[in-house]
């Protein structure tokens, strides 16, 4: 509803939504949707905080979108707990097949994200679609290092998940991969002035 009002207010012309036929494999489609949302929400948390801190979003817009962002947190929280519940109710041999399917989903999503980062759409056309980095730079007006973006997203993810019942499982795969990426990126060198003092 919020997005539809913004689109209407600014007169943005959008292509009509195509028909979405039922998926041939509902479990695969559900897993792709759920894990994809875990990835997107993780970065959305950080970018939203960045927009808020930088003043790129006015207070009224932050207030409008805050419930939307928090709803994303509830979505991925629900998905993580559904996956755990589903695993527990599978027989051992069905669980093996399920884990193989989950690995296949992650392989598909990683490949898809590589294409997005390179700016290539589903039709093979080159696009400026590296949203996490270009979006972050657009918000701050400066180049945003991958490490700083990851640290911000990790902090915001922990903050948003902290308010829920501790008995609920949290999504862990994306934060785990983000911490590995942060370690591989190494610590940034602190800039110094001519006097040796940190800026």
Q: Predicted segments — roles?
A:
Residues 1-199:
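Non-heme di-metal
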């Amino acid at each position: 509803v919020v997005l539809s009002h913004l689109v209407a207010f600014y007169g943005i012309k959008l292509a009509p939504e195509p028909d979405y036929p039922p998926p041939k494999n509902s479990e695969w489609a559900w897993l792709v949707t759920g894990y994809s949302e875990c990835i997107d929400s993780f970065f959305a948390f950080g970018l939203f905080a960045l927009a808020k801190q930088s003043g790129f979003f006015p207070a009224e817009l932050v207030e409008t979108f805050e419930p939307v962002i928090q709803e994303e947190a509830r979505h991925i929280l629900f998905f993580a707990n559904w996956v755990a519940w589903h695993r527990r109710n599978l027989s051992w041999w069905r669980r093996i097949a399920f884990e193989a399917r989950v690995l296949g989903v992650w392989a598909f999503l990683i490949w898809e994200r590589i294409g997005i980062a390179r700016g290539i759409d589903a039709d093979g056309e080159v696009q400026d679609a590296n949203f996490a980095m270009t979006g972050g730079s657009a918000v701050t007006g400066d180049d945003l290092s991958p490490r700083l973006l990851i640290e911000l997203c990790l902090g915001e993810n922990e903050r948003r998940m902290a308010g829920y019942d501790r008995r609920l499982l949290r999504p862990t795969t994306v934060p785990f991969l983000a911490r590995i990426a942060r370690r591989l990126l190494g610590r940034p060198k602190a800039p110094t002035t001519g006097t040796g003092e940190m800026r």
